Amino acid sequence: MPACCSWNDVLQYETNKVTRIQSTNYGTVKWVLHMIVFSYISFALVSDKLYQRKEPVISSVHTKVKGIAEVTENVTEGGVTKLGHSIFDTADYTFPLQGNSFFVMTNYVKSEGQVQTLCPEYPRRGAQCSSDRRCKKGWMDPQSKGIQTGRCVPYDKTRKTCEVSAWCPTEEEKEAPRPALLRSAENFTVLIKNNIHFPGHNYTTRNILPTMNGSCTFHKTWDPQCSIFRLGDIFQEAGENFTEVAVQGGIMGIEIYWDCNLDSWSHHCRPRYSFRRLDDKNTDESFVPGYNFRYAKYYKENNVEKRTLIKAFGIRFDILVFGTGGKFDIIQLVVYIGSTLSYFGLATVCIDLLINTYSSAFCRSGVYPYCKCCEPCTVNEYYYRKKCESIMEPKPTLKYVSFVDEPHIRMVDQQLLGKSLQVVKGQEVPRPQMDFSDLSRLSLSLHDSPLTPGQSEEIQLLHEEVAPKSGDSPSWCQCGNCLPSRLPEQRRALEELCCRRKPGRCITTSKLFHKLVLSRDTLQLLLLYQDPLLVLGEEATNSRLRHRAYRCYATWRFGSQDMADFAILPSCCRWRIRKEFPKTEGQYSGFKYPY
């Protein structure tokens, strides 16, 4: 059993054969596209540092808020309302939050002196009543301030609500004060400490420089590396109004972006700060506008526990840290170069597109005859023929036909279904250019034979003379030398073919037909050229010479070996060859499919 694979099959190399076109226009297009691609690749390599191995940042954040605010508000004591002044420091307006966030209270609503007892519910929607039947004992509404007792009691002179067991008096639904009580909080400052680490590069740093002055304040232009921020400046950089946001509260994002170049020759690793609002700006359209929460201060009075409930409005600052650190890596550089080499194939794609477009049948028939400036583009047809080779699928229905009175070859790719091959139109294909180099190498006796008496020395064209039609020739014959086919009925239409499309002289009467196809010396020389030691008997010699004559005619009239394999010889030529090199029993098989 032969081996399925050998070292000769393994130790080999395959490459593509290319066509080189000497053209100034296409050469210019190629180099322009190459320069564009090279410029883009180089720019992207340097600007985006694609030669580096990137790693995301690992970060920790710590904040400290400083500032004092004086608050003036209405205070009720003994039924008398007067202005009260109070001082708020860091412990009063900041609250511990989880994650990279901190909160600054800017406004509040107090409910003082609450104690756990029974009292009427605040007259919100769904809490008002007219009798005890509207109140259900033990009912707990998520929107309620307590648990209903089942009684309907007066809330004021005009309204009644269900009695609840809760912190009384219940909290009233009040609007946040305008302007905000702690509107001076825009002058507060926050110190942000941000430590980052790139474990893959073993690099750690922070945003606070050793040379930083503790009295500096961040400014986008004058001091962009200072890590102390004024709250009002943060809102100004984000395009927001601190005074308006302070009334209902909101959420502000502080973005710290680290784009670190850790290469020793161009080291740079400093943060860049930016700010933007994260919550819904349209507080009037929001279902729950702003940002607020409740907390309580508990105390005892006459041994009774009481509390002051505070609804705090304020601004939550979320610190968002992101970025990458990059360092030169030879593997990343090789991968990038390898991935961009295919971009240079853009020139090939564009030039092939131009050649294919300007060599199309549409341009040949619809553009070039009417556009004089486009005539130089006809050279693309020549380039296309040199670049592309069309190969037909070797199907049993494929046949090629050549008429001596037509400059082209006809391709027939269909079932004949009893229809004579002579009348099938087929598709016109260009006749391949004949290569005479093989003939010139052979010492063939192709010199002119002596003229017979009365013979003219002028070349007589085959289409100039109309031969009389023989009475024995079939109806489809145009030269008068064809014979009816002897094949079975279902295959007979394949041999119903003449050498001419229109009436005229038969190709078998030409001198070249005799010298190339019927010359015994020429055919024997071709057989010996293939097998120098060939020795055959008379019958075998005739068979060899007959098939060689078939091949000589097909190669002569069709040029291409691919076409010659599927060429159908005219009846007149086929019978003339059989007459010269007959078979003993006189039975011939006809055309055989080569594959």
Swiss-Prot record:
Q: Which UniProt keywords apply?
A: ADP-ribosylation, ATP-binding, Cell membrane, Disulfide bond, Glycoprotein, GTP-binding, Ion channel, Ion transport, Ligand-gated ion channel, Lipoprotein, Membrane, Metal-binding, Nucleotide-binding, Palmitate, Phosphoprotein, Receptor, Sodium, Transmembrane, Transmembrane helix, Transport, Zinc
Observed phenotype of the null mutant:
P2RX7-deficient mice are less prone to initiate inflammation in response to a variety of stimuli. Secretion of mature IL-1beta is severely reduced and initiation of the cascade of inflammatory cytokines is also impaired.
| ADP-ribosylarginine sites (modified residues) | 125, 133
Taken from the UniProt record, the cysteine pairs bridged by disulfide bonds within this chain are 119-168, 129-152, 135-162, 216-226, 260-269
GO biological process terms, semicolon-separated: bleb assembly; calcium ion transport; cell morphogenesis; cell volume homeostasis; cellular response to dsRNA; ceramide biosynthetic process; collagen metabolic process; defense response to Gram-positive bacterium
Q: What is the effect of changing residue 125 to K?
A: Abolishes calcium responses to NAD
Marked site, Selectivity filter 1, at: 342
The record describes the protein's role as: ATP-gated nonselective transmembrane cation channel. Requires high millimolar-range concentrations of ATP to become activated. ATP binding trigers the rapid opening of the channel and allows Na(+) and Ca(2+) influx and K(+) efflux. Has also the ability to form a large pore in the cell membrane, allowing the passage of large cationic molecules. In microglia, may mediate NADPH transport across the plasma membrane. In immune cells, P2RX7 acts as a molecular sensor in pathological inflammatory states by detecting and responding to high local concentrations of extracellar ATP.
- Please state which protein family the record places this protein in: Belongs to the P2X receptor family.
Q: State the protein's name.
A: P2X purinoceptor 7
Which species is listed as the source?
A: Mus musculus (Mouse)
State the encoding gene: P2rx7
